[in-house]
Amino acid sequence: MKNKVVVGVTQRVDKIDIYGEWRDALDQRLVDWVVEAGFIMVPIPNVLVDVSLSNDSQPNLDIWLNTINIDALLLSGGNDIGSVPQRDVTERYLLRWAAKNSK
């Protein structure tokens, strides 16, 4: 049996005022689309990055990436660039990581 491709998917960040929480989120239709295409979908948490670090050094995200071992990367829609710095750092870092680690 052939192994399925594991796709890491970035998430938007939603502020839930009623609970005083910030949450990573994905549209369920995107999840359905990835799964229907035959892939294993793994959401990538934005909380793994430290916005005070450079875009070249994100040790927590590196540990996560090395543990999960994704085969492909999908940047989801969501927040405007600049509105959620944590997401911006996550996606910039992931793009650099993907360029260095393309299979």
What are these model-derived regions, one by one?
Residues 1-103:
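N-terminal beta1-alpha1 cap of cysteine-dependent amidohydrolase-like domains
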